[in-house]
């Protein structure tokens, strides 16, 4: 795993996408952008579209990774999700907002893959 925060985030998103695929999700799109807002992963499981925010950290020094999904960040994700649904020509569908939090246990190259992953389904709601 990289110690560079940007690379750590990219690696976390790769881990999350692989996890979702193994658990029956179909990845529709990664890094969907609407203006300055971004959704890390858009996936589908059964008939539900899942908008997934991935947060990866190398330590708990700044808190659990999921704590970085603040109310402000949630609003940004919701705006991007509405844009995505509009681009499909619908605003009526089964959808939810998930958070995947990854805490890397080791930054050593030979111990790559040592991490804790928490998947919070339906982590927040659009109002």
Curated annotation (Swiss-Prot):
CDD domains: PoNe_Nuclease. InterPro entries: Restrct_endonuc-II-like (IPR011335), tRNA_endonuc-like_dom_sf (IPR011856), UPF0102_YraN-like (IPR003509). SUPFAM superfamilies: Restriction endonuclease-like (SSF52980). GO terms for molecular function: nucleic acid binding. Pfam families: UPF0102 (PF02021). It comes from the Bacteria. PANTHER family: UPF0102 PROTEIN YRAN. NCBIfam families: PRK12497.1-3 (NF009150), PRK12497.3-3 (NF009154), YraN family protein (TIGR00252). HAMAP family: UPF0102. Belongs to the UPF0102 family. This is UPF0102 protein Cpha266_0037. It comes from Chlorobium phaeobacteroides (strain DSM 266 / SMG 266 / 2430).
